[in-house]
Amino acid sequence: MEPLQQQQQQQQQQQKQPHLAPLQMDAREKQGQQMREAQFLYAQKLVTQPTLLSATAGRPSGSTPLGPLARVPPTAAVAQVFERGNMNSEPEEEDGGLEDEDGDDEVAEVAEKETQAASKYFHVQKVARQDPRVAPMSNLLPAPGLPPHGQQAKEDHTKDASKASPSVSTAGQPNWNLDEQLKQNGGLAWSDDADGGRGREISRDFAKLYELDGDPERKEFLDDLFVFMQKRGTPINRIPIMAKQILDLYMLYKLVTEKGGLVEIINKKIWREITKGLNLPTSITSAAFTLRTQYMKYLYAYECEKKALSSPAELQAAIDGNRREGRRPSYSSSLFGYSPAAATAAAAAGAPALLSPPKIRFPILGLGSSSGTNTSSPRISPATTLRKGDGAPVTTVPVPNRLAVPVTLASQQAGTRTAALEQLRERLESGEPAEKKASRLSEEEQRLVQQAFQRNFFSMARQLPMKIRINGRAEDRAEASAAALNLTTSSIGSINMSVDIDGTTYAGVLFAQKPVVHLITGSAPQSLGSSASSSSSSHCSPSPTSSRGTPSAEPSTSWSL
């Protein structure tokens, strides 16, 4: 019997369950419908109240933010309300599906609780719209059963606080800064800088600039400068740093204007005084260039506006002139001058000079040997000898102390060179094209180099030997004084030479050669292609001249230098 009774009870329970299921479904549907209607009515109220949005945009910086839905457009608010309703209804549906043995009373109680929670939530939001002071409490204490709304309200509140704090912090600065920055950046002047430490560093630099000294004109100047640069369209967003310290814009402007302005400083090149006035270390490389660029960027426009000490065209001309002076070679007499000691030192060091004197070897005369052992003295010792033929006896005959070189030639060359340099400088400064300047400069340099070589050769010729030894009989000084050596130049590569010995004049042309310069005088006619040629003497002796190596009673006419 007992098994039969148990089966009957199970069948009755199964028959009751289909009747309970429709009741639970009806209760859930009613509950959802009520929630949707309430949410729709609330969203409709938000749409019909545009004054709330305008109040949010125009509220003062110190006021408390409104509710989270007051900061979003109406369509977004409706979407958020429906999403929250769906999120709140899903957990309750899951809980309701698990109830099998509860009756209609439990379902009704659950529905009443949810409607009360929803009505309480809507009531709190309505009060928040009417009185903004209740908004923080509603954000911190949300309605039960609605945790997502509480989290979002907290996040929105912190965002609003972060947006409001920069406006409060910048309220102590001049009004132009806040207003103009808001106009340019769309109301978010310092929000990007406030995210990191960069904004704090910039604000500290501005504060330090105001507090560098107690000069009462400093604050007035800086305020005026910042306002001027802001109106000009080039605001000063950061303070320049030089030598790991803030560049004092006020003192820099004061020092430069006291000296006459930026153009005057560039022309006079007195940046060292400015550096000392700013208490900058003297070891800074390119301090003048750095100060000039910073002044042009931050202060030159202000100088032109307030004091009009110069114009941008004058500034550009001063910069170009300074650049030309830095690159222009220094044309001076020392560049083309011949100094035997300097030439000897340069040759010993092995460093090629730009306009070094031509290297002509005189191994026999003692001006220099191939080994370079006798280059210390440019003059020839009295013991220097000339060779006659091969192994013939040698005697000494003195010659006048100086060569017959015109003195006026050097002065004429110096005057010509000075005039050429002045003409070249005028052409360079006249604004010709760069190609013409370069070609003209190269031509002038070549011409000056040739003149320098010629003048150096004359200087070297003046230091030629004091005595010449001639094979033959020895004369005393009275007779030797009659001998003369004339030296003239026909071109840069040859020298006309004439020697008068015992009434006989020997003339010839000397050509420059690297190893040794030879002078050979004989009966052969003058030859231009040979290393040295000679012309016949103007007053020949009765006896014919002998060839090389042939002894004769007359003085030998075969010479070798």
UniProtKB/Swiss-Prot annotation:
Compartments where located: Nucleus
Region annotated Interaction with ARID3A, chain positions: 490-513
Residue span(s) of domain ARID: 215-307
Phosphoserine found at: S89, S165, S311
InterPro entries cross-referenced by the UniProt entry: ARI3A/B/C (IPR045147), ARID_dom (IPR001606), ARID_dom_sf (IPR036431), REKLES_domain (IPR023334)
Chain positions found as N-acetylmethionine: M1
Gene Ontology CC annotations of this record: nucleoplasm; nucleus
Interaction with RB1: annotated segments: 203-365
Chain positions with Asymmetric dimethylarginine modification: R361
Domain named REKLES: residues: 419-517
Low complexity composition bias: residue spans: 1-17, 523-552
Domain of life assignment: Eukaryota
Skewed-composition ranges (Basic and acidic residues): 152-162
Record's compositionally biased regions (Acidic residues): 90-109
Residue numbers spanned by region Disordered: 1-36, 53-122, 136-179, 370-397, 523-561
Biased composition (Polar residues): 164-178
Keyword DNA-binding: yes
GO biological process entries: positive regulation of transcription by RNA polymerase II; regulation of transcription by RNA polymerase II
UniProtKB keywords: Acetylation, DNA-binding, Methylation, Nucleus, Phosphoprotein, Transcription, Transcription regulation, Tumor suppressor
Entry GO MF terms: DNA binding
Description of how the protein assembles with itself and partners: Heterodimer with ARID3A. Interacts with unphosphorylated RB1.
Described function: Transcription factor which may be involved in neuroblastoma growth and malignant transformation. Favors nuclear targeting of ARID3A.
PANTHER family associated with the record: AT-RICH INTERACTIVE DOMAIN-CONTAINING PROTEIN 3B, AT-RICH INTERACTIVE DOMAIN-CONTAINING PROTEIN ARID DOMAIN- CONTAINING PROTEIN DEAD RINGER PROTEIN B-CELL REGULATOR OF IGH TRANSCRIPTION BRIGHT
Entry protein name: AT-rich interactive domain-containing protein 3B
Organism: Homo sapiens (Human)
Gene name of the encoded protein: ARID3B
